[in-house]
């Protein structure tokens, strides 16, 4: 699974792209995941979940 991070420039409800797993093959899926994810705080870490 790709790991997402929260961007400081963006709102907390949005997530950044995964670091090394967005390329030609999965651009559309990455964008779709990016739109349908939220950043949540759990156990003092920022993770993204689909909602």
Curated annotation (Swiss-Prot):
Among the entry's GO cellular component annotations, what is one? nucleosome
As recorded in Swiss-Prot or TrEMBL, the protein's gene is named PRM1
Q: Which family does it belong to?
A: Belongs to the protamine P1 family.
Is Glycoprotein one of the keywords? no
- What tissues contain this protein? Testis.
| Tagged with keyword DNA-binding | yes
What's the source species for this entry? Trachypithecus geei
Report the record's Gene Ontology biological process terms: chromosome condensation; sperm DNA condensation
- The molecule here is called Sperm protamine P1
Named from the GO MF annotations, one term is: DNA binding
């Amino acid at each position: 699974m790709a790991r997402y991070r929260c961007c400081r420039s963006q709102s907390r409800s949005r997530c950044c792209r995964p670091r090394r797993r967005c390329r030609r093959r999965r651009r559309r899926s990455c964008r779709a995941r990016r739109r349908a994810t939220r950043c949540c705080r759990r156990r003092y870490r920022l993770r993204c979940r689909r909602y």
